[in-house]
């Protein structure tokens, strides 16, 4: 009995459990996550509005986003970036696990008259014949993946990219990890 309790209370190894499905598809959790995405002053599910505005300005300028740019945004959430890419006349696909966030993103696109292809799916399983110029994965999603999942994502990205295409990953620096203390 003590051995079982010890096992139950032991710290799991990094990436021992993959809980994305539970996190993004549970109705209560998904509702709160969407609220956090849409709160413009917090850096929880999405960056704060000022950061998003500054980063979008840089992304659009740096990658020359416009009429013929094809973009896939992995972990797009409620479309905070995809909407603005589409407003620059880019051809945009957003992929996210959360049905609630995808529904919100689709409603926003419809209301604004934007043609954005939203896919509600675990982005680790996303496949398409379409090739893209830019892949984005914003808000440190890449950091949450195991080394095996990261390799799978990068391999998938390679297959999706047009010649000369780019990948933009928003990741924590090693310095940011050093400043955190696990409790």
Task: Give residue ranges: language-model regions.
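N-terminal auxiliary segments of SAM/dcSAM-dependent transferases
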Residues: 1-24
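Conserved SAM-binding strand-loop segment of SAM-dependent methyltransferases
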Residues: 111-125
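A short acidic, Gly/Pro-enriched loop at the edge of an enzyme's catalytic core
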Residues: 127-134
């Amino acid at each position: 009995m003590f051995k079982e309790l010890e096992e139950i209370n032991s710290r799991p190894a990094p990436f021992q459990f993959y809980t994305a499905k539970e996190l993004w598809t549970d109705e209560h959790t998904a509702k709160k996550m969407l609220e956090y995405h849409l709160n413009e002053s917090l850096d929880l599910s999405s960056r704060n509005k000022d950061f998003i505005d500054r980063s979008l300005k840089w992304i659009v300028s740096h990658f020359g986003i416009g009429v013929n740019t094809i973009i896939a945004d992995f972990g797009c959430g409620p479309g905070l970036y995809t909407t603005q890419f589409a407003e620059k006349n880019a051809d945009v696909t957003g992929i996210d696990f959360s049905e609630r966030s995808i529904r919100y993103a689709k409603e926003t696109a419809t209301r604004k008259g934007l043609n954005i292809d939203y896919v509600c799916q675990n982005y680790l399983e996303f496949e398409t014949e379409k090739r893209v110029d830019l892949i984005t994965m914003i808000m440190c999603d890449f950091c949450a993946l195991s080394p095996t999942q990261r390799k799978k994502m990068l391999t998938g990205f390679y297959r999706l990219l047009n010649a000369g295409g780019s990948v933009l990953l928003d990741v924590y620096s090693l310095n940011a990890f050093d400043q955190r203390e696990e409790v």
